[in-house]
Amino acid sequence: YNSDQIVLSRVRKLAKKYGIVIPIPKKTRTTYVLSTSRLYSIFSNLGYLWGKKSMDKVIPKCILESPLETQKTFVQTIFDAEGYVGKTHCEFATASKSIAYGMRDMLRHFGIWLRINVSMKSATNGTKIKRPYFICTFGGNSIDRFAAQFKLQTQRKQKALELLAKK
């Protein structure tokens, strides 16, 4: 679910670009429903593997081997969707070891050093089963480098990042 109008606008534009028809939104609508069948061919062509659990997800090889501008867009999107900008650091959590280390490798191209710690956490899906999650954080000089090179689409996160970089 997302109520950020910039994110919703981007979803509409991307859907249109790929020929996916989505209903005209109501003023109160904060979500779009896109059937998986429409997205299947687009993401399969990019190397996305369907039917995997979160812990088994990977960053597609085409992203890891792509030009830096493409990797930059991918990193920005991950932080827009999953990231947190705190008072002292930035972070995101993932159940996938592969995604954590893939992000670490991509961020190093930009001079950003990602720390990865494993923590037992429950998913947000309501089950209270604890599983290992990879908590990925960066702070210090890496904040300044991230803020200088990346622009987040989520305005509240971008503003928080700019404030953090000024400290």
Question: Where are these predicted regions, by residue range?
Answer:
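Internal intein/HINT superfamily modules and their associated LAGLIDADG
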Residues: 1-167
